Amino acid sequence: MASRGINKVILIGYLGQDPDVRYMQNGSAVTNITLATSETWKDKNNGEIKEKTEWHRIVFFNKLAEIAGEYLKKGSQVYIEGSLQTRKWKDQNGIERYITEIIVSVGGTMQMLGSRNSSSLTASSGLSKNNDNLSKQLLSEKKQESFNDSKLQNNNLDFDDEDIPF
């Protein structure tokens, strides 16, 4: 099979607000979240620790949308695998608008991290003959041990910009 490229996004971040769950006319769920990711670095000129936060719009479809809507909330830490998509439309004034989103549908993954009871729930949206069995399996599977939060949050790397090889 010839490959035309790879479109895969992996993020770990925190929800900025509660999920927004909607249903399409055919009854399938669509859930939108905003996810914050941050990086920190030491300013080489003055030694100050700097931080930059990026906000990402994530869109879940079908069973993952239902699971995200039920289990995620503002402040939840989550691992996301999806694909990048940019949409274009014209607003009420005829001006072209663009939005870039991470789409989590077939082949995507969501894993809840950092819960209070040190457990996580993993949900994948793979190709399945019976999506109902998939969702029952995901919701009834044993909860997995979550990542060590200190490893995930230790983004304070001590290096100068000149050390970067590019």
Curated annotation (Swiss-Prot):
GO CC aspect terms: nucleoid
Pfam families: SSB (PF00436)
Span of domain SSB: 6-111
Molecular-function GO terms, alphabetical: single-stranded DNA binding
Database matches in InterPro entries: NA-bd_OB-fold, Primosome_PriB/ssb, ssDNA-bd
Spans annotated as Disordered: 143-166
Top-rank taxon, per record: Bacteria
The keyword Transcription regulation appears for this protein: no
Disulfide feature: none
Signal sequence annotation: none
GO biological process: DNA recombination; DNA repair; DNA replication
PROSITE patterns: SSB
Residue numbers covered by motif Important for interaction with partner proteins: 161-166
UniProt keyword list: DNA damage, DNA recombination, DNA repair, DNA replication, DNA-binding
Assembly behavior: Homotetramer.
HAMAP family, per database record: SSB
Function statement: Plays an important role in DNA replication, recombination and repair. Binds to ssDNA and to an array of partner proteins to recruit them to their sites of action during DNA metabolism.
Name this protein carries in UniProt: Single-stranded DNA-binding protein
Taxonomic lineage: Bacteria, Pseudomonadati, Pseudomonadota, Gammaproteobacteria, Enterobacterales
Gene: ssb
